[in-house]
Amino acid sequence: MYVAGVSFQQDTMPVLVHRKLEVNHKPPAVKEIVKHLIQVLNPKLHLYLFPVRRNPGYLKFTISLHLFLAHINCIHYSTSKLPSSSTLSSAKRSSISRNSSSSSLSDITMNSSESLPITLSLLSSNIACFLAFSFAFCLAV
C-alpha cells in the first residue's frame, strides 16, 4: 500500500490533501511510474518516498509531494544522514538547493510539517497538478 499526498503550506496555516492508493506493483515499478508523471506534470512538483514499514514482498511508502515557491528548488537529504531541526533551519535560510533531475527518488527530505510556504497565487495551479497526478496515477495502476 502506498499513500500519495500533496502538502500545501500558506504562511503558517497548512492545507493538506491526501489520497490513499492500493498499489499492486513492486516499489521500483511504482517509483518509475510516479517519476515519469512528476516530470510530465510540473518541474516544481517534487516527489519524496518515505519507507514506513516492510510488508511481505512490498514496502509501504508515504509519497509526499511538496510544492515550493517558484524561485526555490527543493532541498534533498540522503538516507544516510537525516537532518536535525537546526540543519533544516540553516538550510532554509541559505536556500540550499540541488537539481531534482540529479537526485534519487529514495532520498529522504523534510516531512510535510516542515515544508516551505507557498504563495496563494500558486496554490490553485498546484491543486490542478495534484488532481491531474492523482487521475494519471490511478490509471497507471
Swiss-Prot record:
Subcellular location as annotated: Membrane
Keyword terms, alphabetized: Allergen, Membrane, Transmembrane, Transmembrane helix
Gene Ontology cellular-component annotations: membrane
Transmembrane domains' residue ranges: 118-140
Major site of localization recorded for this protein: membrane
Mode of membrane association: Single-pass membrane protein
Protein's name according to its UniProt entry: Allergen Cop c 5
Protein species of origin: Coprinus comatus
